[in-house]
Amino acid sequence: MKKLAQLVLATGLLTTACAASAQGLTAAQARAAIAPWYSLFNQPVEGDMKTLQEQVLTADYESCWGYLPGECWGRDASIKVVGGFAKSIPDMKFEIKEVLVAGDRVIVRGEVTGTPAGDLFGVPHTGKSFRIMAIDIQTIRDGKIARTYHLENWLSALGQLRAK
């Protein structure tokens, strides 16, 4: 009887997992949802940055950067952060290198390049450029990004900017 109960439970879990997977995003849907977000990093600030972000981020969007536990900010703060990068690294580019899809989650491996226009994170301006890796895990809801967990290798960027 115990084995039968375990089999029924396992079958139920497998069925639930398969149903959730079947309802997941396609690769095309995932790229369509994330591409506008990354394009914000690849262009000079033109037009209303807030309107652009509201088109791709849910109203309750959270950006979690992972350096401190529970360190997340909402859509309005994210708008300020992206605008700040556009000013401090005007030639910043984010190139999507790889996209993996798991249900409503989209994992993006990207490469960030740029040349700071002034001091960056306390490193004096040198005119040098950097190239770093970034990993993002995006949760998509109703075609928009609802949450982002992201890590960028800023330590490497600072090392490149300080190099002799």
Which ranges hold each PLM region?
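Short acidic-aromatic low-complexity motifs
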Residues: G24-D60
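A short, structured loop/turn motif at beta-sheet edges
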Residues: V99-I107, T139-A146
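Exposed beta-sheet edge and beta->alpha loop/turn motif
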Residues: E111-R141
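Low-complexity, intrinsically disordered terminal/linker segments enriched in charged
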Residues: Q23, A146-K164
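N-terminal signal peptide c-region/cleavage motif recognized by signal peptidases
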Residues: A17-A19
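Hydrophobic helical h-region of N-terminal Sec-dependent signal peptides
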Residues: L9-L14
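A solvent-exposed, acidic/Ser-Thr-rich amphipathic alpha-helical stretch
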Residues: K50-G103
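Bacterial N-terminal signal peptides that target proteins for export
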Residues: M1-V8
